[in-house]
Amino acid sequence: MTVETFDPNKVANKTTTLETPVKVLSDNQSSQQGVGSRIGFVSLGCPKNLVDSERILTQLRTEGYDVVPTYNDADLVIVNTCGFIDAAVEESLDTIGEALKENGKVIVTGCLGVKEDEIRELHPNVLAITGPHAYETVVEQVHEHLPKPQHNPFADLIPDHGVKLTPRHYAYLKISEGCNHRCTFCIIPSMRGDLVSRPVGNVLDEAKRLKEAGVKELLVISQDTSAYGVDVKHRTGFWNGMPVKTHMQQLCEQLGEMGIWVRLHYVYPYPHVDDLIPLMNDGKILPYLDIPFQHANKRILRLMKRPGSAERVLERVKKWREQCPSLVIRSTFIVGFPGETEEEFEELLDFLREAQLDRVGAFAYSPVEGARANDLPDPVPEDIKQERLARFMEVQGEISAARLKARIGNEYQVVIDSVDAEGAVGRTYADAPEVDGLVHLNGVYDVKPGDRVWAEVIHANEHDVWAVLSEDQDDEEAHATEGAE
């Protein structure tokens, strides 16, 4: 169970088809057939941005463009940017500069694209700039600057689920775009607009295609997952000839029938989230809830334009755990928000001790250009913010370590993510990829990514656990039911 601190050097997850700095397309994902015009691609930021990158790459590959692994091999480079906080803006601008230096022909898209003047002031030679989720515009700009390839026979081999930048056994499923909330620390609505929900049948069709392609875990994402369907008044759609409402609960019910892991991320704490807990307890979706609380003090929450209070959240957490004892809760918090007093910070620490959350991400408040919170009085000095962040980490670190050590002696189903020199590395239902802990199966080599095995936890620290394979892998009734199946 992890506590993440804010690291400006890691704030934007960088995914790229280029060897500089990281190559992520495996040989079977990158065509490299030497046919048609060649594209390099860099994707920065969150999983929502990664899904946008997948859509753009899928369209380009379908049209016959070749995706290549180096700047030098590319005829043009696309940079999908992040602009959420200042450190992400800096990394995006640096990456654009790197692509221009190494290649010279660059198209910019993504969240930072809404600040075209800022980009062109620093990088006037970029070919084109588009905003987020502007898939068709990006492709049109590629057409303008690179000839559309003649028919590439390898393009016919693009699978129905499209190009994926994740390992084969899990995938992100984005169900909506934008957000209707106006949190004072956030500028996402100004970049991505208000909530726009995808048709429920469209979402379920994609989920089915992903399952048929071998995906065993769906990570449901959006800017505000629990608001799904609010913009269309939860209208009824159809899937497989049956009516299904554009609503989070009914979507989860249908996804739960597919027989694969379904994990919910970015869940805003609406009251109807309570209705999802029975689905988790029944094994329809994973008993895992990524729900950002941000703070515990009522006054600070009001300044953030966030709902709730410590008392109400604690009541709900207690109720959820009574209904679903195996529930794992991930949350994020901001310390050092403008105006936060020592007493209000201590209230946050008291909340942590009582809530006993499983996974926590912690961030010292950082001003974001355009955020209304920047205008609030009494900013917290940087040294105090960092001191509070360290204290927050210490408290949550002890909680995380204790909760993981309580798993020692229990058996869990583990999905294998990789095999290295020390053995297999995987995750339980309690571990989302990239952000949570790992299960280390030292000495286990005869497995491959995507396999599922049963294992008993024998050791833990505040981040990861170590486990050994259970003797009987086939008798599921003999194993603990705590791990999701």
Curated annotation (Swiss-Prot):
[4Fe-4S] cluster 1 binds at residues 46, 82, 111. [4Fe-4S] cluster 2 binds at residues 179, 183, 186. GO terms for cellular component: cytosol. GO terms for biological process: tRNA modification. Its cofactor is [4Fe-4S] cluster. Its EC number is 2.8.4.4. It catalyses: L-aspartate(89)-[ribosomal protein uS12]-hydrogen + (sulfur carrier)-SH + AH2 + 2 S-adenosyl-L-methionine = 3-methylsulfanyl-L-aspartate(89)-[ribosomal protein uS12]-hydrogen + (sulfur carrier)-H + 5'-deoxyadenosine + L-methionine + A + S-adenosyl-L-homocysteine + 2 H(+). Residues 165-402 form the Radical SAM core domain. Catalyzes the methylthiolation of an aspartic acid residue of ribosomal protein uS12. Belongs to the methylthiotransferase family. RimO subfamily. This is Ribosomal protein uS12 methylthiotransferase RimO. The gene is rimO.
